Amino acid sequence: MVAYPEISWTRNGCTVSKYPEISWTRNGCTVSKYPEISWTRNGCTVSKYPEISWTRNGCTVA
């Protein structure tokens, strides 16, 4: 029995059919709608602004 049928686990993480643009991976998740945003275990980075790195505690600017 699947507790959450809308969630589909894959080898590297899982996908949620309700939000196809979000793809969770082992290290975090990526959002295909916003490819410049990449979530990681500790927060997220924005490739458009590499100097900005969001973390669990807030954000840092290199």
Swiss-Prot record:
The gene is RHA1. Residues 1-3, 15-18, 30-33, 45-48, 60-62 form a propeptide. Keywords: Cell membrane, Lipoprotein, Membrane, Pheromone, Prenylation. One of its GO terms (molecular function) is pheromone activity. The keyword Membrane applies. Its main location: membrane. This is Rhodotorucin-A peptides type 1. A lipid is attached at residues 14, 29, 44, 59 (S-farnesyl cysteine). GO terms for cellular component: plasma membrane. It is a lipid-anchor. The record marks 14, 29, 44, 59 as: Not methylated.
